[in-house]
Amino acid sequence: MLHFITDLTHKLLNFIKDDPVRPEIPTDFRVSDGRMVAALASNEDDPDAMVCVSFHDFVPAGVDDLKNVAQVPTTAVFYTIWSYKAGKGRDLLIQAVKGIQEQYPSVNRFVTLSPKTEMARRFHLKNGAIIFRENVETVNYEYNTKTGD
């Protein structure tokens, strides 16, 4: 089941501590205005995968850019993702894209703000993304919005 988390009271936020990509980002920032956490979980005590999403009208090049959210967002930015079970990160991205398209009709672009690591590169390219832009410290991968892949 897909969960979109936008408030600090949700039990799945206890698992933010496991974020291997951007552990320095505080939990309250992840669910503040223009941001949310999406989780794939059958219950609130056992997530399969989690991703943090920020909404913008541009493609951010660095973590500091995540502070600038849009009133009418056109771009969903996946800025950290991790999974507890094989294949569930991919499943979460597909379901999150579909859910965001339904709940945020102004969003028509799906990109990442990924670290420059081989693991991130393999994950996103294997799951159908293209490299949109290489930045100083990050890479923006872009997903096809028609299929969610």
Feature map (PLM): residue ranges:
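Short amphipathic alpha-helix that is part of the acyltransferase structural core
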Residues: 1-31
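A short helix-loop-beta-strand connector motif used in the catalytic cores of GNAT acetyltransferases and
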Residues: 26-49, 54-57
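Preference for well-ordered, secondary-structure-rich cores of eukaryotic proteins
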Residues: 39, 47, 96-107, 111-115
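Conserved acyl-donor/pantetheine-binding loop and adjacent beta-alpha core of acyl/acetyltransferases
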Residues: 52-76
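Conserved beta-strand-loop-alpha-helix junction that forms the acyl-donor binding cleft
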Residues: 83, 110-122, 137
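Conserved acetyl-CoA-binding loop-helix of GNAT-fold acetyltransferases
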Residues: 83-102
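Conserved acetyl-CoA-binding loop of GNAT-fold acetyltransferases
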Residues: 125-135
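C-terminal "cap" of GNAT-fold acetyltransferases
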Residues: 136-149
